[in-house]
Amino acid sequence: MAFDFARATKYFLMWDFIKGFGLGMRYFVSPKPTLNYPHEKGPLSPRFRGEHALRRYPNGEERCIACKLCEAVCPAQAITIDAERREDGSRRTTRYDIDMTKCIYCGFCQEACPVDAIVEGPNFEYATETREELFYDKQKLLANGERWEAEIARNLQLDAPYR
């Protein structure tokens, strides 16, 4: 039986233990990748799909032209739209509802909209206490659009070369 000097040296000097200890110490002193979530927020992609919003033109007029493409393309059938004609011949929505309990956040509504009226904004913190609060009507969607307009416009501008 031959004596294995390399194996004995490795065993005697506890080389594996030293390598493991060194690796542990390297991670112990390195900066932590974890965010303290409620107090720190990480970056979001411009393509992030969060809470829905209806946008307005800079003059205050609603962008939605009641084409109902978003309603037709929604695979979850979460969008309901009623529309009427105006005196000038254009159409506008009288009712625009989204059932957020059905929504799967696929983004098809945003992609189908020819005037960028319906968008999925950057807000992902909209937990509710009751189910009824997840039924968004036109006023709630317009309020979301007004609240997040600056960030929505920036995200759409950043994503424009890829659309």
Curated annotation (Swiss-Prot):
GO CC term, one of those recorded: plasma membrane
The keyword Metal-binding is annotated on this UniProt entry: yes
Positions contributing to [4Fe-4S] cluster 2 binding: C74, C103, C106, C109
Entry's cofactor comment: Binds 2 [4Fe-4S] clusters per subunit.
Entry's localization field: Cell inner membrane
Family per similarity comment: Belongs to the complex I 23 kDa subunit family.
Protein name: NADH-quinone oxidoreductase subunit 9
